[in-house]
Amino acid sequence: MSLFLAPIHQIMYDKIHYTDDLATALAKKDPSTARALEENFPAIEKEPLEAVIDEGNIHGWLAERVVLAEKRLAFAACALAKKDRAGLMDAVKDFGRKEAFSGSADEAFILYDRRFLNGMPCDRVHMPEEAKEGVAWRITRDVHGEYYDEAGLYDALIAAWWEGLLDGSELNYHRDGNLCTLNCQVKCNSTEW
């Protein structure tokens, strides 16, 4: 439990906003979903963290916003999946593509880790794994499934985001069970094309 604001709290606040921005972008694809999202879930504060956080309960305040952002994203995604699953995945790909990423597997993972909520940092949801090439991590527990009506929908959203993010790069995201990898589609260091 923290007694004062630290950089990790700003990182969490930024992740909360990114998740909420994705929820809002998805909801805008369907006016009734956008309306229902705002009616059923309060908006997340946009003011600077130090202006809105309860400094007497930093961890609790952030945890409440994590849950709210997760619920907002799940609501928007589940509503759109029922109406137009392909359109939902295209919208998530576009959201990832807007990052205009170019870089290494390490840089891609750092970007992903700085964007998405995967519990609180102390939860250690992503654990690094040995990789011959690129980056690998194991998902130690599902912190998103409880918010979704459809099993696996969050994982599909993340896969679509990775597809958009890595569009045009030599990197490839792959998930096999709880093991995720980022590596080259072709020999990244090769001069033979």
Regions found by a protein language model. Name each.
Residues 144-147, 188-193:
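Short, charged/polar, Gly/Pro-enriched secondary-structure boundary elements
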Residues 131-178:
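Short, hydrophobic/π-rich interface segment
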Residues 1-132, 193:
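N-terminal accessory segment detector
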Residues 175-189:
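Beta-rich nucleic-acid/ligand-interaction surfaces
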